[in-house]
Curated annotation (Swiss-Prot):
Species this chain originates from: Bordetella pertussis (strain Tohama I / ATCC BAA-589 / NCTC 13251)
Name the UniProt record assigns to this protein: 2,3-bisphosphoglycerate-dependent phosphoglycerate mutase
Family in the record: Belongs to the phosphoglycerate mutase family. BPG-dependent PGAM subfamily.
Catalytic residues of the enzyme: 9 (tele-phosphohistidine intermediate), 87 (proton donor/acceptor)
Stored InterPro entries: His_Pase_superF_clade-1 (IPR013078), His_PPase_superfam (IPR029033), PG/BPGM_mutase_AS (IPR001345), Phosphogly_mut1 (IPR005952)
EC number of the protein: 5.4.2.11
GO biological process, one term: glycolytic process
Pfam families: His_Phos_1
Organism lineage: Bacteria, Pseudomonadati, Pseudomonadota, Betaproteobacteria, Burkholderiales
Residues holding substrate: 8-15, 21-22, 60, 87-90, 98, 114-115, 183-184
Keyword Isomerase included in the entry's annotation: yes
Catalytic activities: (2R)-2-phosphoglycerate = (2R)-3-phosphoglycerate
Gene designation per UniProt: gpmA
Length: 250
């Protein structure tokens, strides 16, 4: 049996402000740093150790990983950083407040933009300074692979090559792997691992800073999965994620 641990980054500044973040490179809040520290302490307390870790090129995920590994006294762990683990690109929605957007367009439309499998928000213009082609960290990525917007289907198509070429072979080689990434890049992995339907993936919410353990058989098929930590706290965090895209009630 193999084990894989997935972890969404701790609370970011735009999580706190309830804004669509996507590829915008915002940092963790103090709460987010504390979540990462507690996650690392929990992993250490439960006896977890890792031979290899992976994360995205966005600082909120990188810093979460650093803090967690530091709390485990394991900052020597080799880390692979790859753009394919980035958050889903939210196009023109990036930077907008989710509740205000819901008040303008309706809860249902925002839920579609946030969670529908094959519907993407309006793309960024090619000349928009927020377009990733203007960001030096993507300079070596072919221009036709850089998104101006994405739906979850697009995110799955981006993430799975990295799973197939890097993460899965490492697990099969017996390496203990931790992936610190983002809500939607992790949903892409979960959809693949659990064979979640396009409709059901809409209801999958991943809380920040909570280690999610997958026990896998020799074919990397899930035997079971579970969050470490307090169940009530995790349920509340998942409910909070689900509520982010709803208009505020007076």
């Amino acid at each position: 049996m193999y084990k894989l641990v997935l972890m969404r980054h701790g609370e970011s500044q735009w999580n706190l402000e309830n804004r669509f973040t996507g590829w915008t490179d915002v940092d963790l809040t103090e709460t987010g740093r504390e979540q990462a520290r507690k996650a690392g302490e929990l992993l250490k307390r439960e006896g977890y150790a890792f031979d290899l870790a992976y994360t995205s090129v966005l600082k909120r995920a990188i810093r979460t990983l650093w803090i967690a590994l530091d709390a485990m006294d394991a900052m020597y762990t080799p880390v692979g950083i790859n753009w394919r683990l980035n958050e889903r690109h939210y196009g023109q929605l990036q930077g907008l407040n989710k509740a205000e957007t819901a008040a303008k367009y309706g809860d249902e439309q925002v839920l579609i933009w946030r969670r529908a499998y094959a519907i993407a928000p309006e793309p960024l213009d090619l000349e928009d300074p927020r377009h990733p082609r203007f960001d030096g960290r993507y300079a070596k990525i072919p221009a036709d692979q850089l998104p101006a917007t994405e739906c979850l289907k697009d995110t799955v198509a981006r993430v799975l090559p990295f799973w197939n070429e890097s993460i899965a072979p490492a697990i099969r080689a017996g390496r203990r792997v931790l992936v610190a990434a983002h809500g939607n890049s992790l949903r892409a992995l979960i959809k693949h691992l659990d064979n979640v339907s396009d409709d059901d993936i809409v209801g999958v919410n991943i809380p920040t800073g909570q280690p999610l353990v997958y026990e896998l058989d020799e074919d990397l098929k899930p035997i079971r999965h579970y969050y470490l930590g307090d169940a009530a706290e995790i349920e509340a965090a998942m409910a909070a994620v689900a509520a982010q895209g709803k208009a505020k009630k007076d």
